Each structure stands twice: as structure tokens, then as C-alpha cells.
């Protein structure tokens, strides 16, 4: 918030986390210093996951009173991930002018392509190979739509997000088809 108060929100996997107001100009340099430590340790990219930000359930009302520099969270939540990705890229380039950053995010908004690679998010197969085929089929229109929506660099989790699948021959076939599809993605990566 503008009074530098942190809004805590329940983390989907337990506990709380803070929501950084990337719309506040002073936050950029603070975040740049924060992210520089892992860069100095050798990383060259960031996966800005859950930039919506994700809520563990929609019944939680904390977001209704969360005020950012540009307005109430429910009014600007679609641009939240974009502002995060913008700060990450600009701060990386400012502090590391001779290096190139890699970023990947699932929180898409107009202009995303200027800062980061798009990612379709976790596509879960659960514990069932038949669900995996459905998830693979879903990725094709999602990635094509992203490209038509001017986010040409979009990828998915090759093999989905599997649980404990014990039907190994069926999983091997699905895995092969995921890899074949992934070979035609702008970024091919196995999850």
C-alpha cells in the first residue's frame, strides 16, 4: 500500500505471504536489490509464477481491501503480473547490462511479450493417463491463442504435472506425444 504496509495473504500451500506493490515506483529499486543476490550466485532467469496473484480460494476477502499505488487490487489485478515482470526485467538489465535475462510467467496481460515468456500454467494429469491426454489437447489451442494474441513466445509443461501414474506403457505413449508437441513450442521444456 502507499503507506508501505504489507498485505499478507494466505499462501495456497499453508502459511502467509506478502504481496509486493509493483505499481509503486520506489519498489523497483528495492526489488532489484532483492533479486540481485541470486543473480550474483549464478542464475540467469526468473519464473514469476502466481502473478495474478493466486488465491487459495475465492472466498478470501483480503484482496477486497488491498490497495496498491494505482488503485484497489480488484481494479488492477489483471495488470499486477505485468508490473512484476516489467520490474524484474528492467532491474535485471539495469544491474547487469552485459547479460540477458530469461523470464517465464503465467499471468498474461497485454504487453507481456515485452518482458517475459508466457507459460500456460500447471496442467495436471493427476493420477490418470486419460486426463493427461485431455491436458495435452488443451495446450494446443491455448498456445495458438496466445500467439494470435501477440504473445508469440508461449510454452507449456511438457508431460503436464503428473501424479503417481503406474500404467507405465500408457504413460510412455503420452510422454512421447507431449515431447513431439513440445518440439514445436517456442521453448521446449519438460516439467
What are these regions (language model features)?
Residues 1-191:
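Catalytic-domain carbohydrate-binding cleft regions of carbohydrate-active enzymes
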Amino acid at each position: 500500500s502507499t503507506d508501505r504496509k504489507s498485505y499478507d495473504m494466505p499462501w495456497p500451500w499453508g502459511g502467509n505471504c506478502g504481496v509486493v506493490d509493483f505499481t509503486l515506483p520506489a519498489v523497483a529499486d528495492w526489488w532489484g536489490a532483492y533479486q540481485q543476490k541470486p543473480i550474483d550466485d549464478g542464475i540467469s532467469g526468473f519464473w514469476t509464477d502466481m502473478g495474478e496473484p493466486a488465491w487459495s480460494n475465492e472466498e478470501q476477502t483480503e484482496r477486497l481491501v488491498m490497495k496498491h499505488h494505482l488503485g484497489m487490487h480488484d481494479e488492477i489485478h489483471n495488470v499486477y503480473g505485468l508490473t512484476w515482470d516489467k520490474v524484474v526485467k528492467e532491474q535485471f538489465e539495469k544491474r547487469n547490462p552485459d547479460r540477458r535475462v530469461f523470464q517465464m510467467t503465467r499471468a498474461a496481460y497485454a504487453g507481456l511479450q515485452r518482458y517475459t515468456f508466457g507459460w500456460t500454467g500447471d496442467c495436471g494429469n493427476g493420477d490418470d493417463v486419460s486426463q493427461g491426454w485431455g491436458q495435452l489437447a488443451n495446450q494446443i489451442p491455448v498456445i495458438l491463442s496466445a500467439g494470435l494474441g501477440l504473445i508469440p513466445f508461449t510454452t507449456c509443461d511438457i508431460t503436464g504435472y503428473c501424479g503417481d501414474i503406474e500404467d507405465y506403457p500408457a504413460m510412455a505413449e503420452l510422454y512421447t506425444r507431449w515431447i513431439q508437441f513440445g518440439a514445436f513450442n517456442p521453448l521446449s521444456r519438460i516439467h
